[in-house]
């Protein structure tokens, strides 16, 4: 019996050691082979999601640029009164809420001879409705044609947006950017058109992607 117990003890010991060895090899195998592949897969999935969101964002910005091209080619065909009537429809885009507003900003004397500032700017109020804003035509307002966004827009190639750095003011709870694009009449500089875009739609795209 003692010999049998000794043999059983040895087998038990060998079995325990074998199990421990297999556990060690399994852990090492997972850490060395499986885990890196899992991390790579997770990283690739994350990168693919980021790329998809970036592509959608670029698509939304391209829509704004296409909208702006329509505006900058339409405005030179209109007289001053017609600009005020037509512009809200060009800006609104059937109530597209990411478009906070938009305007046209003629160079001094271009829209009305002898008039220094004669812009038309519409933006959304708290209910999402477009309302006209005449502040930039008032005497206390700085000259819009001297602002960085204006100068940047004047330098753009035909049909291309100059995107402003993100900013935030009291007019909206969300940060915004704007696309400024040059307007030319008869091949000569006439002014700049802007479309203000709220950046909140970035969050909406990310939220939909995470679902």
Feature locations, PLM:
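Extreme N-terminal signal-anchor transmembrane helix of membrane signaling/transducer proteins, especially
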Residues: 2-36, 40, 44
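Extracytoplasmic/secreted envelope proteins and their assembly/folding machinery
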Residues: 47, 65, 84-88, 147-150, ...
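Amphipathic alpha-helical bundle/coiled-coil segments
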Residues: 54, 58, 143-150, 180, ...
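Short beta-alpha junctions and helix-cap segments that line functional grooves
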Residues: 87, 164-165, 204-208
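Extracellular/periplasmic ligand-sensing ectodomains of membrane signal-transduction proteins
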Residues: 95-159, 165-173
């Amino acid at each position: 019996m003692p010999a049998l117990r000794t043999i059983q003890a040895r087998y038990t010991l060998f079995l325990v050691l074998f199990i421990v060895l297999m556990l060690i090899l399994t852990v090492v195998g997972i850490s060395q082979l499986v885990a890196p592949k899992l991390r790579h897969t997770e990283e690739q999935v994350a990168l693919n999601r980021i790329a998809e969101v970036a592509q959608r964002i670029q698509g939304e910005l391209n829509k704004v640029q296409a909208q702006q091209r329509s505006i900058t080619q339409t405005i030179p065909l209109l007289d001053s009164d017609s600009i005020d009537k037509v512009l809200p429809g060009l800006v609104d885009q059937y109530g597209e809420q990411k478009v906070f507003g938009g305007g046209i900003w003629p160079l001094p004397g271009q829209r009305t001879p002898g008039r220094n500032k004669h812009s038309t700017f519409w933006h959304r109020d708290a209910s999402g409705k477009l309302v006209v804003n005449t502040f930039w035509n008032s005497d206390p307002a700085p000259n819009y044609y001297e602002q960085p966004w204006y100068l940047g827009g004047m330098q753009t190639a035909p049909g291309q947006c100059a995107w402003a750095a993100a900013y935030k003011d009291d007019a909206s709870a969300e940060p915004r950017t704007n696309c400024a694009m040059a307007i030319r009449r008869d091949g000569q500089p006439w002014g700049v058109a802007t479309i203000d875009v709220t950046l909140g739609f970035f969050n909406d795209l990310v939220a939909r992607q995470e679902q």
